[in-house]
């Protein structure tokens, strides 16, 4: 049986922490859809198109992964794809509190909806898009925080 999942997020930008979760999901699922959210409630550093492009570049060598953008409810996206499972990364207890609430909200919208949580490896547990943006803003080296194949694209931010 072919089992697929969706890994949603803003990916602003995609990080080595995200890649860690993607690779772990690929060990469990046959197909992983990385779904880049438009999320108008946030003010992204990278525009929507850039975030999709960065995610596609970062995952291009992982055959099980595809990247899409979405601007609707995650549950509606999942239903439209015939997928009832999403994966999320958990770095700390604070992540769990937030993700638990979101998971319950999604399950209340669709009873078949499941959320699977992955912990990143210790070397990536501290990495967040916020940290990458902060280091980038102050001219620091983000080379160990993001996939090498998107490093120059991130440094040459277009939007």
Curated annotation (Swiss-Prot):
Homohexamer. GO terms for molecular function: ATP binding; pantetheine-phosphate adenylyltransferase activity. It is found in: Cytoplasm. The keyword Zinc does not apply. GO terms for cellular component: cytoplasm. CDD domains: PPAT. InterPro entries: Cyt_trans-like, PPAT, Rossmann-like_a/b/a_fold. Substrate binds at residues 10, 42, 74, 88. Keywords: ATP-binding, Coenzyme A biosynthesis, Cytoplasm, Magnesium, Nucleotide-binding, Nucleotidyltransferase, Transferase. The lineage of its organism: Bacteria, Pseudomonadati, Campylobacterota, Epsilonproteobacteria, Campylobacterales. Its EC number is 2.7.7.3. It is an enzyme of class 2 (transferase). Reversibly transfers an adenylyl group from ATP to 4'-phosphopantetheine, yielding dephospho-CoA (dPCoA) and pyrophosphate. The record marks 18 as: Transition state stabilizer. Pathway: Cofactor biosynthesis; coenzyme A biosynthesis; CoA from (R)-pantothenate: step 4/5. NCBIfam families: coaD_prev_kdtB, cyt_tran_rel. Belongs to the bacterial CoaD family. This is Phosphopantetheine adenylyltransferase. One of its GO terms (biological process) is coenzyme A biosynthetic process. HAMAP family: PPAT_bact. ATP binds at residues 10-11, 18, 89-91, 99, 124-130. It catalyses: (R)-4'-phosphopantetheine + ATP + H(+) = 3'-dephospho-CoA + diphosphate. Its cofactor is Mg(2+).
